[in-house]
Amino acid sequence: MRVLLVEDNALTRYTIRALLEKLGHEVVGEAEDGPAAVKGYSESKPDIVFLDLILPGKSGLEILEDLRAVDPAARVVVVTAVEQDEIDRTLNDKGVAAILRKPFSFEDFKALMSGLR
């Protein structure tokens, strides 16, 4: 799968990139904020976006809306440490492909990726 990473934390970005590559996926772009995410999506046309929920400037929810304005079928995995039922309901209502909770294990990540195929 071709993946765009949208995450402001360099260590988390590095970790997700390494796990994706270990599982045979291609990271086609990285972004740290909303404008870079939308630009990266438009330029790279990824199969899926890993999107942090809390980013500088715009929230992940706002960026999700921006991505869907570019491509209503955009597949997005939200990455977050926030555990709230209301957030989960909102994300599910917005049609995210999955929610990846931080911290996560390799097995958690592998299972998530297997379910996305």
Locate each region found by the language model:
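Acidic, metal-coordinating helix/loop segments flanking the phosphotransfer/catalytic sites
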Residues: E30-I48
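The feature encodes the CheY-like receiver
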Residues: P56
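Short amphipathic alpha-helix used as the core "switch/output" element in two-component signaling
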Residues: L61-P72
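Two-component/phosphorelay signaling modules centered on CheY-like receiver
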Residues: A10-G29, K94
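Alpha4 helix (beta4-alpha4-beta5 surface) of REC/receiver domains from two-component response regulators
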Residues: E62, E83-L100, A111-L112
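Acidic catalytic/metal-coordinating carboxylates
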Residues: D33, S59-E62
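Conserved acidic carboxylate
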Residues: E7
